Amino acid sequence: MHSFDGPGRTRPLLRRAALLGAALLAVTAAAPQASAATSGADRGPSGGGLSAVIRYTENGIPHILAQDYAHLGFGTGWAQAADQACVLADGFVTVAGERSRWFGADAATDGSLSSASKNLTSDLYFKGVREAGTVEKLLAAPAPAGPTRDLKELMRGWAAGYNAWLAQNKITDPACKGAAWVRPVSAVDVAARAFAVSVIGGQGRAVDDIAAAQPPARAASLAAGPTTGPTTGPATDPAAAAEAARAFFDTGRYDMGSNAVAFGGSTTANGHGLLLGNPHYPWQGGRRFWQSQQTIPGELNVSGGSLLGTPVVNIGFNEKVAWSHTVATGTPVNLHQLTLDPADPTAYLVDGKPEKMTRRQVSVQVTGGGSPVTRTQWWTRYGPVVTGLGPGLPLPWTAGTAYALNDPNAANLRGSDTALAIGRARSVTGIQDALKRTQGLPWVNTIAADSAGGTLFTQSQVLPRITDELAARCSTPLGRATYPASGLAVLDGARGDCALGSDPDAVQPGVFGPGKAPTLRDAPYAENSNDSAWLANAETPVTGYERIWGTLATPRSLRTRGAVEDVSAMAARGGLTVADLQKQQFANRVPAGDLAAADAAKACAALPGGVATASDGRPVDVSGACAVLAGWDRSADTGSRGALFFDRFWRKLTASTPAKDLWLVPFSAADPVRTPRTLNQAAPGIGRALADTVAELGAAGIAPDAPLGEHQFVVRGGQRLPVPGGTEALGVWNKIEAPWNAAAGGYPEVVHGSSHIQAVGWDGGRCPVARTLLTYGQSSNPNSPHYADQTRLFSQERWVTSRFCERDILASPQLEVVWPRERR
């Protein structure tokens, strides 16, 4: 099952190997813990190299047992490579800046580690990071500003484990079998991947615009370089700029989101807390989760999901606490508008004194050999010069003005330290303390519960220290448009008094300290679905934060509204158990349907002759759709008839009809969960959306009342697996996003959505009560037995019972134990 070449493979002697693992547990528990200074090769049982004991249970979930952090990293790197060698290797090509060399300069990236549109711009960015020594400098910084010794040992061990697996096994995944770009890595490579994840919401989103930035004369002659759009537009139109900035930072536009809810002891059956975590992440590529349990006896014992390439558990649980993250609304960057030296467009003025930009010349090797492609990047005291934030917000570099991007997470390599510290916490107070000490989360909220019944919501993310006062005092005209709309500050870079400053409790300059983070402690429930902190608990709104953290008293998404309705009702009902969390995950209620389907059916029935006019002007008989809408059960279960029709109809209607014309009752901050509501049956877009949907499905041979699962599915091993859940537009908790492909039968592949799901509680015993599900399985290798096993469970709305305690691990009927070791 788990390829291993050598004496560590123990399947023929399974029980003996199980006892070996138990013995190692007993020995290391009794022995004093290795210090960071003495942990490493001289302590391994393999004659000088690192090693670990890995016990695999059902669905290929590894329980990694090690004596210190280096050995734990080794076991984790080994086990990740066994499941995801090709995806990991692809990511290491990215952070090395070598995609153009292996895959072609003009080919599109997979978007896992940046938003670069082409391999060339990706390489120019990451090669520039590498040649500047950015990651090495961050690694050298002393903790807490830099990574701890424990984390460095984990990264060193992870690289050694990954390399050992590659050296001792043959890759069977066709994605990279025999590929020359699969190569050994170093601890710096592991850290470089962590850096990419840290900046993915900031510099990583602006990679094309960093590559495109050239002084005016040079930009005019660099026809072969990447471009980001016109040099006129929203930058000179305040309303358009505000909308472009809002859209650029809208969490709903990107392929990451999440739901999570923590319930306090007053709402549960036994007084212990409960946590349901449901991150919405990509199903393919380098931002997949991967499950494991990591154990250093007496030091660490944590189970959960890790982002690929990460040596720690990012979301999960231990004996006392459970936590998850949701993508936050904080704007992780700001711009500084530069006033340029009239004599030199590569110099800018600060308090009247010119400062030269730093010129970084970066060369990238491309396929076919020959001369490398060389470009120049321009950096300032604030960060890199950019020519826009996506095509919608051009920021032209003229003779008098340029724009620099400040991303404080480019100085943050602490994310894995935060995860490690949370994994060692014993209460939600301990989690809060871990966040305060490490301050490593770049773009997520934290929701947590503990065995004592405590709950926590906090938006403890690394953000530029942009106060509303600073924005009011220092915003340029562009910033006065973008900051209220999106939290994107554009500050006057020519004024020294517009520097960001520091908070006394911040571990790096220019960011907010954790004391400023929106936080809610010990509420009966704390929930987030990627809106701002305001309605983490609708009965106790969170207020008082600066605009850069998110909005207050503004409309919530349908997913937030539906989630708050559900979890507040659950909390009011009380007596909750893990089983209630499982029911919530797969309730598949469609809030948009509850709000609009009945009125849409009435509007349909009122159409003269049952005919509506489509977008192309053709009359379409929609009479058959009226009964489908009326009879639909308002769910996104695989057997639901009408869910597919409503989904296609609702997308078309909301894309063409502004909210002010769609609802009769507008949004009210006094009633934010229930407004806006009451569909305007007279809205002209309803008939058109009905006609377009009937025509679309008819052309594809799909009946209006076709069950959702017949047309929302994935194919694994030649088997079609129906997929439950619904889209962001529908507001479904169990979010599923799939590209529409009528020729292939509807939605034939999920691109992102529910991923590492966990429902966790406690019953007073030593072992947490946990059910988990990794929707896409542990492995991307179609030859692996764990390529689709959990996808089948997801299709059937079934769960994996977690094995956390030692007796449960050893009792697994599918137990397989391996003892990988480093060969020297």
For every predicted segment, state its role.
Residues M1-T38:
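Secretory targeting and sorting signals
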Residues G40-L274, P279-G285, I296-E299, S303-S306, ...:
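Substrate-recognition/specificity elements adjacent to catalytic centers across diverse enzyme folds
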Residues A66, A70-T121, S324-P372, G501-R556, ...:
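Gly/Pro-rich active-site capping loops and adjacent beta-alpha segments
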Residues L151-Y162, G285, G415, G430-A434, ...:
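Stable alpha-helical elements in mature extracytoplasmic
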Residues I296, V302-L308, G316-V321, H325-G487:
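Glycine- and hydrophobic-rich flexible loops that cap the catalytic core of alpha/beta enzyme folds
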Residues L441-M570, F649, L653, P666:
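Hydrophobic alpha-helical segments
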Residues N537-S615, P707-R824:
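Terminal end segments
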Residues A643-G726:
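Charged, long alpha-helical assembly modules
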